[in-house]
Amino acid sequence: MPKIEVKPYNQDDKSKKQEVAEMFDNISARYDFLNHFLSLGIDKIWRRKAINQLRSIPVINIIDIATGTGDFAIAALKLNPEEVIGLDISAGMLAVGEQKMIKNKVDSIIKMQLGDSENIPYDSNYFDALTVGFGVRNFENLELGLTEMLRVLKPGGKAVILEFSKPKRFPIKQIFGFYSRYFIPFFGKRISKDAQAYSYLPESVAAFPEGKDFEEILHKIGYKNIESTLVSGGIATIYAGIK
């Protein structure tokens, strides 16, 4: 069966990339509150665990793809880099992120930049490390985005990808299924005023090639020493690979 593309608004005249940018622009003002509220704050723990995967390599510069408002970029400061780039296609999310960087007095290190993950505006072999938090399932062309990520990494550089997955074990599978299908869309709609944005979340998670399937895609593209770590009973997975 052909793979069905999951888009936030399912508009025939717009690409997935356009709809994703529009969606995040629409919810940018309430995104941080909703993100931490709906994840019960666990997303912060996941990011810290993901960043710890990069402690095995020297990190002078790092790019956070699909950075949103920059939470992962801020978490990357634990690695003491000299330069952090936060790249995103949503101008609305970046505007919120820029104010966050100024408020936290880290705007001299973290640069928020408008850009496309499938056409990263940096030279090949430029970054020591790369992170993506809950962003790869939003790529219009998953393999192209992953290929671009590999291109901008230096030889020996490391990519760490944090993404939602589907728990397999009782009772986490049942609890997460109910939570993602009903609780998140209900509160997301009322707080963000965008009904589709938080219905898109469980739909995009369900369609994403997780686990071994995603590892095979990474291997096919050219990532090496690929590892995956389940967190919180499989609600999310941390993938890591070397160039």
Residue ranges of model-derived segments:
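N-terminal auxiliary segments of SAM/dcSAM-dependent transferases
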Residues: M1-E22
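C-terminal alpha-helical "lid/dimerization" subdomain adjacent to the S-adenosyl-L-methionine
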Residues: Q18-E19, I89, L162-I217, I221, ...
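Conserved alpha-helix/loop element of class I SAM-dependent methyltransferases that forms part
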Residues: R30-F33, S39-I60, A75
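Class I SAM-dependent methyltransferase SAM/SAH-binding core
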Residues: N61-N119
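A short acidic, Gly/Pro-enriched loop at the edge of an enzyme's catalytic core
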Residues: E118-A129
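A short glycine-rich, Lys/Arg-flanked "PGG" loop and its adjoining helix->strand segment in the class I
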Residues: E143-P155
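C-terminal lobe and adjacent flexible extensions of AdoMet/dcAdoMet transferase-like proteins
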Residues: H219-K243
